[in-house]
């Protein structure tokens, strides 16, 4: 594993560390498979929960705390070693030119950022950081947007999430929340 950029390389213990940034709205089976892939390549993984300040919107229905709980439940259910990852909430700054610096102020040193999102990839590369793509795991199905759509339409959504995450969403009233916040009192 190569050093990401001067001053950002391997941690003091000499371990290869990866970064995975996502909104996880909600955390689904594709995210879980991606984390498995990353942990096969890295000694440790930093999971950054982006847009941490947003919740209760149709695009971002869950709070940062709820998303962290979902990730923890799924990784525990899949028997991932908790010493191999950390989960850190990262609020947005709304300015692309400073977003990477902002994120770096929240996370420990890492070697590589894993992403398939074109803007995220571009911003990290412009900052001189190493970026690697993640293999897509049935992206057409495993998509948070698709899961939220299925919830709204009353279609099967549970099969796309780890069982512990589906149960958690139901336990916090997440289904009704997504339906409520998608409605509007405005005439179209």
Please give the residue ranges for each predicted region.
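Nucleotidyltransferase catalytic core that binds NTPs
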Residues: 2-188
């Amino acid at each position: 594993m190569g050093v990401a950029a001067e001053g950002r390389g391997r941690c003091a213990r000499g371990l290869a560390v990866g970064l995975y940034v996502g909104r996880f709205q909600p955390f689904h089976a594709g995210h879980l498979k991606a984390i498995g892939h990353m942990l096969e390549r890295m000694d440790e993984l930093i999971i950054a929960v982006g847009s941490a300040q947003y919740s209760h919107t149709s695009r971002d229905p869950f709070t940062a705390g709820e998303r962290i709980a979902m990730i923890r439940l799924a990784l525990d259910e899949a028997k991932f070693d908790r010493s191999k990852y950390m989960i850190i909430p990262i609020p947005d700054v709304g300015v692309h030119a400073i977003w990477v610096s902002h994120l770096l102020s929240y996370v420990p040193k890492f070697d590589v950022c894993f992403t398939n999102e074109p803007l995220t990839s571009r911003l990290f590369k412009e900052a001189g950081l190493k970026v690697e793509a993640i293999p897509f795991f049935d992206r057409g199905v495993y998509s948070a947007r698709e899961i939220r759509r299925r919830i709204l339409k009353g279609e099967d959504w549970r099969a796309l999430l780890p069982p512990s995450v589906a149960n958690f969403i139901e336990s916090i009233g997440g289904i009704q929340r997504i339906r409520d916040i998608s409605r509007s009192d405005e005439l179209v």
